[in-house]
Amino acid sequence: MHNVVISGTGLYTPANSISNEELVQSFNTYVAQFNADNAEAIARGEIEALTESSAAFIEKASGIKSRFVMDKDGILDPQRMAPRLPERSNDEWSVLCQMAIGAAEQALQRAGKTAADIDGVIVACSNLQRAYPAIAIEVQEALGIQGFGFDMNVACSSATFGIQTAANSVQLGQARAILMVNPEVCTGHLNFRDRDSHFIFGDAATAVIVERADQATSKYQFDIVSTKLLTKFSNNIRNNFGFLNRAAEEGIGARDKLFVQEGRKVFKEVCPMVAELIGAHLEENQLNVSDVKRFWLHQANLSMNHLIVKKLLGRDATEQEAPVILDTYANTSSAGSVIAFHKNQDDLPAGSLAVLSSFGAGYSIGSVILRKR
């Protein structure tokens, strides 16, 4: 069995950003038009009037102030309220592939690797652009990587599940190094007409190089000490979009074909599950929570992260102990915890212990214990 390290990370950030104020202006314009168009039905009590949103409400509910997006104009158009991403020919790289390439090239550079050093590609994300061929194989082709590639989906936990999958391949000698990528166009499955969730997501892509420790040469190395995964079925976060939708015409375009969640139930149920799993994971490795210098957590909701770390530490965490990026990136699903890792790792001294954890739909939770070399 080979010892395994993360030797490089990469980040692709879209050029466009939407502030809470911009998002609210679009949403409230839609609300005013809807209420005006349905005034008589609302007066008769047949339908409920929609309620306006506010930037203050969004920040208080989530900690989010802005988000990066692949398309801004389509989202902010009150007549559309969805990203506008023209279909590409089969001879062009797909949107997810384009994003993955941007993150992957940076990760390869930081790891000091070329395509010739990589034996496999894993694309792990919450929404795949198509059924087949695999996006990972397209990324493999775009970067000139030999070996194998495959896609996997564990929603917001896809990155930690992908890291374990990559680590297993390297540990067993099936690959020298694996490129694991998380391209997320979360705005594509978000209902921008839903007051409770229209602000939640942003777009981004991350990449991680997992390789044998004895061949790693970069200055960004972290030993993968241990990984631990957990899943438990729940309908509280769900998206029913799929290839069988066309077989049931009555459901096409329904609200459940986009992201839906029972937010309060998710908060109540997931926070203790995550804290318990991380705590048990550390204990299994004869490590104390007090030994952990940094927690890179899934970036979905600021209050969730505060509560999880408080359950673990028995006190409030500092900004250095549990870095936050969701204020400017929002929830980027599987990419979020890796963005926090990518942007907040260089200051840690050698020997520092850290935990990378993601959690979300499924329910699914992943924990990766890392030690900086």
Regions found by a protein language model. Name each.
Residues 17-18, 132-135, 163-164, 189-195, ...:
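Short acidic, glycine/serine/threonine-rich loops at helix termini
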Residues 7, 124, 153, 178-184, ...:
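Short beta-strand segments
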Residues 97, 101, 108, 127-128, ...:
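Claisen-condensing/thiolase-fold acyl-transfer catalytic domains that form or cleave C-C bonds
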Residues 6-8, 58, 121, 162, ...:
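Conserved small-residue
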Residues 6, 50, 54-154, 282-305:
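Conserved beta-ketoacyl condensing-enzyme motif
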Residues 182-183, 190, 232-239, 301-302:
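Acyl-CoA/ACP chain-elongation machinery
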